[in-house]
């Protein structure tokens, strides 16, 4: 939503306002039940890093991030473009939560396939995201980074490990 907006200053203000509401009001109402997860201005990794630190000061240690930022028109994970973002997450012990489909792109077999096919192969987004991460310098540069691949299940993990071992 905010990534595509023309007024980036207003968008950044909206991100901060959303995080304040989400952390303080929504999750703050039931702190033993809800875990807040911040959003960040993905169009600027330095602004994103600042928002991660600001959210951490409020007690929020999880942040959403696209499983494939390149599909959103942003630089890919293999570039140092994202270093300020990942450095901030490591610095304040914030988990990077990569949600499947957050790149606005899901794996499809064919345009005429029923929705059931897409639902069944959704974990492939997690498989693709993990493989992309493994071959980036991110995990070496930021060895204490914590990453969560959300809603992809675990059935694909043995296959992913086997592929990584023999690639």
Functional labels for PLM-detected ranges:
Residues 9-25:
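Active-site-proximal gating segment of KS-fold condensing enzymes and close homologs
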Residues 1-3, 114-115:
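A short small-residue
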């Amino acid at each position: 939503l905010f990534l595509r907006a023309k007024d980036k200053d207003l968008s950044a203000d909206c991100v901060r306002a959303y995080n304040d509401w989400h952390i303080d009001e929504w999750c703050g109402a039931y702190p033993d039940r809800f875990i807040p997860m911040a959003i960040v201005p993905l169009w600027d990794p330095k602004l994103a890093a600042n928002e991660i630190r600001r959210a951490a000061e409020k007690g929020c240690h999880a942040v959403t991030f696209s499983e494939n930022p390149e599909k959103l028109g942003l630089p890919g994970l293999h570039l140092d473009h994202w270093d300020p973002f990942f450095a901030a997450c490591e610095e304040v012990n914030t988990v990077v939560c990569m949600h499947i489909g957050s790149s606005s792109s899901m794996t499809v077999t064919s345009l005429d396939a029923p929705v059931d096919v897409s639902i069944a192969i959704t974990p492939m987004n997690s498989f693709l995201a993990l493989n992309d991460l493994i071959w980036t310098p991110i995990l070496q540069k930021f060895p204490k980074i914590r990453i969560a691949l959300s809603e992809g299940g675990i059935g694909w993990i043995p296959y992913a490990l086997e592929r990584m071992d023999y690639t």
